[in-house]
Amino acid sequence: LMLKTLAGVAVLATLFGCATPAHDSAAGGPIALKAMGSFHVGGREVELKGRPVKDMVFTPGGAPARIDPNGVYQVEQMYVQYFVPQAGQGQLPLLLWHGGGLTGVTYETTPDGREGWLNYFLRRGWTVYNSDAVERGRSGWAQYPDIFPTDPVFLTKNNPFERFRIGDGPGSYN
């Protein structure tokens, strides 16, 4: 058993020695998936009526497009993308649920380009569900103030770092 363990460590050391730099997202090699997909959870339909039709130009010099905001909208749903690894372990999947006004992309990579928690758990055989909460990311936004009653919140680039005390500064977890 000891000899097999040492041989395994030698193989891993060789593989890691040949790996690309740590900032390269492919550093751990390809991830083999059995399945991946997405779905929405919850939500409701809302119908808008009596709103003015607008002509808008989306591309400089382009032809105007007529936008009619009247109709049925799907709102307040959560978007979930799932990944099932080829060689799975664990009886239950792992749900990555962000907070603080962020999105599921929080778990895909780190700010400096390294792999995030999504790949970390996939590489260890866990089925992972990565969510975008209501009114965030790929879950979509509802019109304000017609459907969603409060102003949308937009965060600066530094806001999460300051709020969660990451990096340099007083009270930071450096």
What are these model-derived regions, one by one?
Residues 1-7:
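Bacterial N-terminal signal peptides that target proteins for export
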Residues 23-89:
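N-terminal cap/lid segment of alpha/beta-hydrolase-fold proteins
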Residues 87-89, 94-166:
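Short, surface-exposed "cap/lid" segments of acyl-processing enzymes
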Residues 172:
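Flexible, surface-exposed loop/gating regions in the mature catalytic domains
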